[in-house]
UniProtKB/Swiss-Prot annotation:
It comes from the Bacteria. Keywords: ATP synthesis, Cell inner membrane, Cell membrane, CF(0), Hydrogen ion transport, Ion transport, Membrane, Transmembrane, Transmembrane helix, Transport. The lineage of its organism: Bacteria, Pseudomonadati, Pseudomonadota, Betaproteobacteria, Rhodocyclales. This is ATP synthase subunit b. F(1)F(0) ATP synthase produces ATP from ADP in the presence of a proton or sodium gradient. F-type ATPases consist of two structural domains, F(1) containing the extramembraneous catalytic core and F(0) containing the membrane proton channel, linked together by a central stalk and a peripheral stalk. During catalysis, ATP synthesis in the catalytic domain of F(1) is coupled via a rotary mechanism of the central stalk subunits to proton translocation. Component of the F(0) channel, it forms part of the peripheral stalk, linking F(1) to F(0).
């Protein structure tokens, strides 16, 4: 009988220990485990959120780089267009200056040719008078001489 009484006593002690453990020990352990699980879940959620934020930031960076490249391309195209426009304007200005210089040179050449013709006419008139004077071997009156030169000059024109 001792075996039965010991067994019953051990069962009673076991149930008291189980009840005590369930009442006082188990709730703090469960609470600690729940808190730990919550911290782990929060950490995983934060990691997932950080990963999503990183992906979003990478997308933003890629978009900003694309915009920057586009903007750089636009700036480069604008600069090339402006440079081309400046070159065209410089060419037009150079053409205008060359045309003006050509016109001025042609006008100067025409004026020089006209002056040369006038000088040549004067020389021809003087030579003709000198030749006529030598042929006639006589002195011509200065007034008559001037009239002859003017008439000869008019005829040569």
């Amino acid at each position: 009988m001792n075996l039965n009484a010991t067994l019953i006593a051990q069962l009673v002690v076991f149930f008291i220990l189980a009840w005590f453990t369930m009442k006082f020990v188990w709730p703090p352990i469960v609470k600690a485990l729940d808190e730990r699980a919550k911290k782990i879940a929060d950490g995983l959620a934060a990691a997932d959120k950080a990963k999503a934020d990183l992906a979003l930031a990478e997308k933003k960076v890629v978009e900003e780089l694309r915009k920057a490249r586009e903007s750089a391309g636009d700036v480069r195209a604008s600069a090339e267009k402006q440079a081309s426009q400046l070159v065209d304007e410089a060419r037009a200005e150079a053409s205008r200056i060359i045309a003006q210089a050509r016109e001025a040179a042609e006008a100067e050449a025409g004026a020089a040719a006209q002056r040369a013709k006038e000088a040549l006419r004067d020389q021809v008139a003087h030579l003709a008078v000198a030749g006529a004077e030598k042929i006639l071997r006589r002195e011509i009156n200065a007034q008559v001489h001037a009239e002859l030169l003017a008439n000869l000059k008019q005829e040569l024109q």
